[in-house]
């Protein structure tokens, strides 16, 4: 049985996810340089779930419960710096 091919370009919020990947590659995977783009993706995903329901899925969005956690974490002003310092050790 063949797996169904996913058209990623038609996935909700896919363009935001691609912008993050481009930013991470350009910045040497320094997440703090891409903060605005990450926030934009999460905002897009939140709108997606609000309009389609929490059972909806997009390959570009975390599942609703993880998205809520990620948004809460990003509200912490030190989240990027902490992650970068941890990664350096």
Curated annotation (Swiss-Prot):
Record has Flavoprotein as a keyword: no
Tell me the ranges covered by the CHCH domain, including all copies.
Answer: 10-52
First-listed, main subcellular location of the protein, grouped into a coarse class: mitochondrion
User: This protein's superkingdom?
Assistant: Eukaryota
Q: Which UniProt keywords apply?
A: Disulfide bond, Mitochondrion, Repeat
Name the Gene3D superfamilies for this protein.
CytochromE C oxidase copper chaperone
In terms of InterPro entries, this protein maps to: CMC4, Cys_alpha_HP_mot_SF
Q: Where is this motif: Cx9C motif 1?
A: 13-23
Cysteines joined through disulfide linkages: 13-44, 23-34
* Location of the protein in the cell: Mitochondrion intermembrane space
Question: Which Pfam families does the annotation name?
Answer: CMC4
Give the domain section of the comments. The twin Cx9C motifs are involved in the recognition by the mitochondrial disulfide relay system.
The family assignment reads: Belongs to the CMC4 family.
Q: What is this protein called?
A: Cx9C motif-containing protein 4, mitochondrial
Source organism (scientific name):
Yarrowia lipolytica (strain CLIB 122 / E 150)
